Amino acid sequence: MCDDEVAALVVDNGSGMCKAGFAGDDAPRAVFPSIVGRPRHQGVMVGMGQKDSYVGDEAQSKRGILTLKYPIEHGIITNWDDMEKIWHHTFYNELRVAPEEHPVLLTEAPLNPKANREKMTQIMFETFNAPAMYVAIQAVLSLYASGRTTGIVLDSGDGVTHTVPIYEGYALPHAILRLDLAGRDLTDYLMKILTERGYSFTTTAEREIVRDIKEKLSYVALDFEQEMATAAASTSLEKSYELPDGQVITIGNERFRCPESLFQPSFLGMESCGIHETVYNSIMKCDVDIRKDLYANIVMSGGTTMYPGIADRMQKEITSLAPSTIKIKIIAPPERKYSVWIGGSILASLSTFQQMWISKEEYDESGPGIVHRKCF
C-alpha cells in the first residue's frame, strides 16, 4: 500500500449518477447515469451484436427500445446483479483499469442497512479482487471537500436527502435525519404538473426529457406566493423548451412550483417536513453548545441543491426558524454536484488515511463484518 504509483479509485455510487475517477484528481473522470437497460423487443437482425443489457450512457441513448431500471433506490442498492454490472462498466469501460491493482473507495448514504455495506465489501474483494477498500459516508466527504471539520451537511441527490451534523470531524449519528424526497420525486412531480398544461409525458424515456427540463429551467422562488402572483400577471417568467422531435413547449410557474416541493412536501402528498425544517430539526437534536457553530456552517451538496435561488431561500427560511441573534451562513460551493466525489478524492490521497484501508488479508481473516469495525 505504500507504493505511491498506485492511485486509489474513488467511486461515488449515487441513486441517479455514478461518479468515478482517481484519488488526487480534482474532478471525476467518468460521470454516467446509474441505469441498466434491457431490450423490450425481440432482436430479429443477425450479427447486430445486440446485448442483453446496456449500462449508463449507452442505455440512455438507446432508451427508446429499452426498459430502464435504477439498481439504487433511495440510496440503497436493491439489485445486486445490476449493481455489479455498473461497477464492472465503471472499472473496465469508463476508467479502463484493473480493479485488482488499485484500492477502491466507495461511498454510502448514512442510515443505510448494515447488510448493504457488507455486501459491497464482499463483491469488491471476491468478484473484483480489490487489494484494499473502504466505505465512506457521503455527507462527510462533502464536508472534506468544503475544507471544514465542523458543519451540518445537507446532501440531496436523486434518491435521498440527508442532514448530517459533524463536529470537529465527528459525525453525530443521533442527529442525522434522512428524507426520502429528492430529485427523482421532483422529476415525477414536474411530469404531473406539465400534464395540467396539456403536455403528456409517461414512459421511462420521456421521464428523462422532463428531468432535462427540470435541470435547465427550474429555480427556487424567494417568496413563493409573490412569485405565483407575478407569473399570473405577466408572461415575464415563461421560458420555452424544444423537445427532441422539434416541438416547442412553454413552461411558466411550473419552473418554480417543481422545486418548491423541497420546502413544501405537501405538494407531493408527503407528510414530512421541508428541507429547511429538516436542517433545523437536525441542529436541534445536537448539544446546545455546538448549535451556534452548525448554524454558521450549513453546507449544501448534491445535484438537487443546484437550483438557482436555493441558497437564498434556505437562508431566509432558517433565519425565521432560528433564534434571532444567531449568525446563519449557507455554504453552496459551485462544484457541489460533485463534492462527495471530490471529498473522496481528498480523503483517499491523505497520507494519514493509508492505514485506514481494509486490506484483502484482513477481509480473508474476518469476513465482511470487518467493514463495521474499520469504516464509520
From Swiss-Prot:
The modification Methionine sulfoxide is found at residues 45, 48. Keywords: Acetylation, ATP-binding, Cytoplasm, Cytoskeleton, Hydrolase, Nucleotide-binding, Oxidation. One of its GO terms (molecular function) is hydrolase activity. Its EC number is 3.6.4.-. It comes from the Eukaryota. One of its GO terms (cellular component) is cytoplasm. Disulfide bonds: none annotated. The modification N-acetylaspartate is found at residue 3. Its main location: cytoplasm. It catalyses: ATP + H2O = ADP + phosphate + H(+). It is found in: Cytoplasm, Cytoskeleton. InterPro entries: Actin, Actin/actin-like_CS, Actin_CS, ATPase_NBD. It is an enzyme of class 3 (hydrolase). CDD domains: ASKHA_NBD_actin. Oxidation of Met-45 to form methionine sulfoxide promotes actin filament depolymerization. Methionine sulfoxide is produced stereospecifically, but it is not known whether the (S)-S-oxide or the (R)-S-oxide is produced. Belongs to the actin family. This is Actin.
